[in-house]
């Protein structure tokens, strides 16, 4: 049954074996991070491209982590099971919605550490020993841009190649589309 309130909704982090050759799932489910024991909730687990680490978000409960001040990132070493609470990366404001670089040494994430209202893109480096280093905000050509922009960067995603469109292309297409009708 669903809890009476979203504040009681919590998700554990589990894994199950998968046989890619046969397209079948294993029978055993392993709980890697137990929501009941940890008194929190996990979301957005993403394995590094090299398969060594799992980066995920932890919040007090399980909905819309960017809205939770306490939300932070945690890093699990998939070889040892060790969990790093990333004290050099996390702030006292929402840190969530992450993505890995193709080389597994960098990750981008959204943080509200600046003003507490708007998510900004930060980058953190993960060295060969798995130690995360102090993040920095996405540089802007105008240093005041983030202070003057009333937009939030919620889900940064890293790409190895340039995207074949720009914001004005999306805006133009959006204006041409007919809105979905609800019946």
What are these model-predicted stretches?
Residues 1-183:
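Sequence signature of WD/YWTD-type beta-propeller architectures
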């Amino acid at each position: 049954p669903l809890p009476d309130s979203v504040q009681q909704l919590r998700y554990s982090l589990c894994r199950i074996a998968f046989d890619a050759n046969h397209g079948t799932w294993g029978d055993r489910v392993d709980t890697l991070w137990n929501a009941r024991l940890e008194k929190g909730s996990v979301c957005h687990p993403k394995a590094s491209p090299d398969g060594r680490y799992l980066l995920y978000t932890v919040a007090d409960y399980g909905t819309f982590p960017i809205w939770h001040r306490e939300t932070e990132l945690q890093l699990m070493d998939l070889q040892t099971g060790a969990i790093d609470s990333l004290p050099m990366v996390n702030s006292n404001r929402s840190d969530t919605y992450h993505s890995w670089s193709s080389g597994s040494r960098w990750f981008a994430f959204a943080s509200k550490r600046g003003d507490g209202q708007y998510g900004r893109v930060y980058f953190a480096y993960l060295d060969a020993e798995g130690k995360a280093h102090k993040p920095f905000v996405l540089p802007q050509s105008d240093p005041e841009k983030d202070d003057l922009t009333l937009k939030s960067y919620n889900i940064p995603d890293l790409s190895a190649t340039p995207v074949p469109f720009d914001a004005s292309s999306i805006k133009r297409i959006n204006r041409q589309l007919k809105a979905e009708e609800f019946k």
